[in-house]
Amino acid sequence: MCSFLDVEVKDRFVEGDFGMSEMVKSNLANCSSRVKRPMNAFMVWSQTQRRKVALQNPKMHNSEISKQLGVTWKLLSDSEKRPFIDEAKRLRDKHKQVSDYKYQPRRKTKSFLKNVYNHKDHLTKATDQLIKTQHLKEDSTTIYENTMKCPEISSFYCAQESTYLDNWMNLPPEQENTEFWQGLFTNETETCRSLPHGQMDCNECRSI
């Protein structure tokens, strides 16, 4: 017994109306009437080879099959490629007889172009940030190197660091928080006094 749903589906199938939009129908009609480009020698050869590889490896993905065929084709000698090269030439000559042929590459979708532009913008921003960071590092290194070239400043900082470290290592644990910091400022004053008068740096030395 046939239901109402079966009758409706069967009628739509017979009429050929699958609920497709007019744009989809138009694209299908254009694809069926469009003249395809002729195959090259590799495509002619891979037609039969692809079937063989697919039968031998049913679970192999199509992209992996293509990679394997590409490697195998490169390993073939010129004499082995010759029949397929001749066949490809015959197909090209036959294709030239079609006067209304026009190369029509596939149009890239808007979403694809948007992803390309977004990726390009991201790379540009990342590159700019990397350049700015590199410039900051170079400037800091140059300032430090120029500063340490001055003998008075270099010896002053080296003496400070050595004095602070020695005082801290020689302090008992119960006095490290008070005497260390008191000695720090005392040593700073003594170190500054050893410098020429115009290069004194601490507040006490400036008042001398």
UniProtKB/Swiss-Prot annotation:
Record's protein name: Sex-determining region Y protein
Record's subcellular location: Nucleus speckle; Cytoplasm; Nucleus
Function text: Transcriptional regulator that controls a genetic switch in male development. It is necessary and sufficient for initiating male sex determination by directing the development of supporting cell precursors (pre-Sertoli cells) as Sertoli rather than granulosa cells. Involved in different aspects of gene regulation including promoter activation or repression. Binds to the DNA consensus sequence 5'-[AT]AACAA[AT]-3'. SRY HMG box recognizes DNA by partial intercalation in the minor groove and promotes DNA bending. Also involved in pre-mRNA splicing.
Keywords, in A-Z order: Acetylation, Activator, Calmodulin-binding, Cytoplasm, Differentiation, DNA-binding, Nucleus, Repressor, Sexual differentiation, Transcription, Transcription regulation
PTMs per UniProt: Acetylation of Lys-110 contributes to its nuclear localization and enhances its interaction with KPNB1. Deacetylated by HDAC3.
Subunit and interaction comment: Interacts with CALM, EP300, HDAC3, KPNB1, ZNF208 isoform KRAB-O, PARP1, SLC9A3R2 and WT1. The interaction with EP300 modulates its DNA-binding activity. The interaction with KPNB1 is sensitive to dissociation by Ran in the GTP-bound form. Interaction with PARP1 impaired its DNA-binding activity.
Single GO BP term: brain development
CDD domains documented for this protein: HMG-box_SoxA_SoxB_SoxG (cd22028)
Domain of life, per lineage: Eukaryota
DNA-binding region: 35-102
Protein encoded by which gene: SRY
Any one GO molecular function term: RNA polymerase II cis-regulatory region sequence-specific DNA binding
Principal cellular location given in the protein's record: nucleus
Record flagged with keyword Transcription regulation: yes
Keyword Zinc assigned: no
Annotated family: Belongs to the SRY family.
Entry's Gene Ontology cellular component terms: cytoplasm; nuclear speck; nucleus
